[in-house]
């Protein structure tokens, strides 16, 4: 029995339970495949094929119920994340010089990072990773205050086995807020260096702004683009001003 999601839980627990809810669906798909093979087998007795057909129908009905529960859980998670992104808490303190050198988000004020907020996260340096890459993550936990404040962020993309995305521990210096889609944002001047999410990925790369389009999106030239002179259009809220 999959544990139901409670709206008062933290995002981590909600994601874990959501992935657990996918297991019965995977099992039912395997059962359906077995039923299909039996029904499709011309050499199988007719009684066995009819029995497999009935079992397949029953499995489909069970799968429908599981999918309904899963969709409800996913909608609850989305609602929590949307609320967190729609109402960020912002203080009036200006960024310190050291923080500004590391990177700034769409506002000149210090952002108060909260659970559920979407952020660009700078991957740490490890033996297997040279570091410096930025990926889209979700803040799932905040501890401490002031200089001792720490964050846990999670990659929203599940791994190849369908498990929940990796969780990282970090500080505010390695985070940039990603504004919610539809947030009014000022245009960015041509030739400005930015971090932007490359289309169809969750990774942010350095780019140069060519111009802002009438719909507010930005036409960019990404650093290291294989196709020489290629220009790419990216939605404005996924283009982050960055001086790093």
From Swiss-Prot:
Known function: Chromatin reader component of the transcription coactivator SAGA complex. SAGA acts as a general cofactor required for essentially all RNA polymerase II transcription. At the promoters, SAGA is required for transcription pre-initiation complex (PIC) recruitment. It influences RNA polymerase II transcriptional activity through different activities such as TBP interaction (via core/TAF module) and promoter selectivity, interaction with transcription activators (via Tra1/SPT module), and chromatin modification through histone acetylation (via HAT module) and deubiquitination (via DUB module).
Subunit structure: Component of the 1.8 MDa SAGA (Spt-Ada-Gcn5 acetyltransferase) complex, which is composed of 19 subunits tra1, spt7, taf5, ngg1/ada3, sgf73, spt20, spt8, taf12, taf6, hfi1/ada1, ubp8, gcn5, ada2, spt3, sgf29, taf10, taf9, sgf11 and sus1.
Region spans: Histone H3K4me3 binding: 222-225
Location of this chain's protein in the cell: Cytoplasm; Nucleus
Principal localisation: cytoplasm
This protein's name: SAGA complex subunit Sgf29
Family statement drawn from the similarity comment of this UniProt entry: Belongs to the SGF29 family.
CDD domains cross-referenced by the UniProt entry: Tudor_SGF29_rpt1, Tudor_SGF29_rpt2
